[in-house]
Amino acid sequence: MQKTKMIFTIGPASXTEEMLVXFI
């Protein structure tokens, strides 16, 4: 989960990161 969060944080997904993390 942490790895995915880091990848999303680095990417252009800022707000979407929260939704994905949550989802994952």
Curated annotation (Swiss-Prot):
What GO molecular functions are on record for this protein? ATP binding; kinase activity; pyruvate kinase activity
Q: Which leading EC class covers this enzyme? A: transferase
Q: Which cofactors, if any, are listed as required?
A: Mg(2+); K(+)
Sorted alphabetically, the keyword list is: ATP-binding, Glycolysis, Kinase, Magnesium, Nucleotide-binding, Pyruvate, Transferase
Tell me yes or no: is Magnesium among this UniProt entry's keywords: yes
Pathway membership, UniProt: Carbohydrate degradation; glycolysis; pyruvate from D-glyceraldehyde 3-phosphate: step 5/5
Q: Its domain of life?
A: Bacteria
Q: Is this entry keyworded Magnesium? A: yes
Q: For this protein, what is the EC number? A: 2.7.1.40
Catalyzed reaction equations: pyruvate + ATP = phosphoenolpyruvate + ADP + H(+)
Please report which protein family the annotation says this sequence is part of. Belongs to the pyruvate kinase family.
Subunit structure and binding partners: Homotetramer.
Q: Would you tell me the protein name for this molecule? A: Pyruvate kinase
State the species of origin.
Clostridium pasteurianum
Q: Which gene encodes it?
A: pyk
